[in-house]
Amino acid sequence: AVVMTRKEIELLCYLLTHRGQILSREHLLKNVWDSNGFVLERTVDVHITHLRKKLGQYGKRIVTKSRYGYLFSV
């Protein structure tokens, strides 16, 4: 069984809902994280890294688009 944090699940669901679309770190922070608090953009990168590891071979579907953000490839 794969154990994920609530935020990892929320991020994965958001990526899946918007699969095929490039989503910037800023966009992900606004839509997945609580915008009331201060959150660093690096937080997205860390969560993406954890998701990729936990998804194993399927983690490769989360693609980094340099200087743009991330997308879940279909």
Residue ranges and their predicted role:
Residues 72-74:
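C-terminal edge and immediately downstream basic/flexible tail or linker adjoining helix-turn-helix-like DNA-binding
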Residues 69:
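Alpha/beta-hydrolase active-site loop signature
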Residues 1-59, 64-66:
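Positively charged, aromatic-enriched patches within helix-turn-helix-type DNA-binding elements
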